[in-house]
Amino acid sequence: MPKVDLSSIEETNSTGYPEPYASDVARRRYRRVGAATGLARLGMTHCTLEPGGWSSQRHWHEGIDEIVIMLDGEAVLVENDGETVLRPGDLATFAADVANGHHLVNRSSRNCSFVAIDNRDRKSVV
């Protein structure tokens, strides 16, 4: 099954965040592509942010490397060093164990989408 049909993977906007933090990600929809396709060592999430949507609360990872690949639209990467606009084809990488709190925010007037990929280390802490 090399080619993945995204429409065959359940899309959700569920969150584990309690209020008031959950409302920040209410305009986020995502598909857990890695889990749905049987990847055991890589996590992959396809995410769509509606205008005003956040990808998550700002966070960083112990034991997990992460890469974000912008697919469509425009999002603002918010991190410790400031803010950077990401457009289709742009990449952002986050090395494990570097305390750089980050997330994406859609400040544009249309949806944007990206893929986030990380290594699945069972000892990791987010």
Q: How would you name each of these model-derived features?
A:
Residues 1-41, 51:
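A short, N-terminal "cap"/entry segment at the start of jelly-roll beta-barrel domains
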Residues 50-54, 74, 83, 98-100, ...:
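Short, charged/polar surface micro-motifs in flexible loops or helix N-caps
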Residues 125-126:
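Conserved small/polar residues in nucleotide/adenosyl-binding loops
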Residues 80-97:
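Short acidic-glycine-tyrosine-enriched beta hairpin
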Residues 46-50, 60-78, 117-119:
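Short, conserved beta-strand element in jelly-roll/cupin
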Residues 29-30, 45-61, 99:
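Conserved short histidine dyad/triad with adjacent acidic residue
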Residues 38, 96-122:
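Ligand-binding loop in jelly-roll beta-barrel domains
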